[in-house]
A protein has these predicted regions:
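Basic, polyanion-interacting recognition surfaces, primarily
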Residues: 1-100
């Protein structure tokens, strides 16, 4: 379980349902399988510290759960829901490794 605060409430979220997380204007948005998107005031680095090894940072603004990795292209990847996310140049090989 992942415990976090969102809009003044302490919430818990099953880690296996997290598809990806995005940082936008210093706010963390966590997209899930079944819960929609939830919001928290947390850094992406702090979020990643609490996640298991199958979560990787693919870009300055994104962390993905590799269990939901559906496809890899040049400097982008597709996760569940056909969401296309950017991949940093230096992370391309890492993402491809998890896809294989």
């Amino acid at each position: 379980m992942f415990y976090f605060y969102s809009e003044g409430k302490k919430l818990r979220l099953p880690i296996k349902q997290i598809i990806y997380a995005e940082i936008l204007n210093h706010d963390l948005y966590i997209t899930t399988n079944g819960w929609g998107t939830v919001h928290s005031r947390m850094t992406l680095a702090a979020f990643l510290e609490k996640m298991p090894d199958n979560f990787i940072r693919i870009h300055h603004s994104y962390v993905i759960n590799t269990d939901y990795l559906m496809g890899v292209g040049y400097r982008e990847c597709t996760v569940a829901g056909n969401v296309v996310l950017p991949v940093a140049r230096g992370m391309q090989k890492t993402v491809e490794k998890y896809f294989m």
